[in-house]
């Protein structure tokens, strides 16, 4: 089953790479996109695992980027899926959007899971790398690599770190604002 999943995921990734090279970006406000994904995940995981996902912003009115709407959805959904996978029941996940200096937007996804082993923060974006314990199920190790590629397609960066304020992980996506 794991080999079949790897082949399927890898095949999908290759198709996505070809599709990405043909897709056109346009000016989009990422806030409603992110809120929609957060709402969708809350509808499932609040009941299923007692996990509450909150959305916060820095009070900005609009968060415009040049992007591809469904790819931004894919980035947020994949990062939330990972945060949920590493969170115990009845925990909180926060998605924060804020404007940074230099016309950039930061999207932080903060969970209350186990956090990262320091040696893993650089490896997790590699193709086929997975540090997920067996209790979380089998995974291909392609998800965060795909996210990284999608972020880079949007001329952005992604970083993984441990939270400073409490136990848990922090994934930060930085995208150029228009």
Model-derived features: positions:
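Short conserved segment of the HATPase_c
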Residues: 116-128
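Short helix-loop "hinge" at the ATP-lid/N-box region of the Bergerat-fold HATPase_c
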Residues: 83-84
């Amino acid at each position: 089953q794991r080999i079949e999943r790897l082949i399927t995921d890898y095949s999908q990734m290759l198709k996505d790479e070809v599709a990405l090279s043909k897709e056109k970006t346009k000016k989009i406000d990422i806030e409603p996109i992110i809120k929609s994904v957060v709402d969708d995940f809350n509808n499932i995981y609040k009941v299923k695992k007692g996990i509450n996902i909150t959305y916060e912003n820095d009070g900005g009115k609009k968060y415009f980027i040049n992007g591809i709407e469904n790819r931004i959805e894919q980035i947020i959904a994949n990062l939330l899926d990972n945060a949920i996978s590493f969170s115990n029941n009845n925990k909180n996940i926060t998605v924060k959007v804020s404007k940074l200096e230099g016309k950039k937007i930061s999207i932080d996804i903060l969970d209350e899971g186990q956090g990262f082993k320091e040696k893993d923060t650089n490896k997790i974006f590699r193709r086929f790398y997975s540090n997920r314990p067996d209790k979380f199920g089998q995974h291909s190790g392609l998800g965060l690599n795909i996210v990284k590629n999608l972020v880079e397609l949007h001329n952005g960066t992604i970083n993984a770190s441990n939270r400073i304020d409490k136990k848990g992980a922090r994934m930060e996506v930085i995208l150029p604002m228009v």
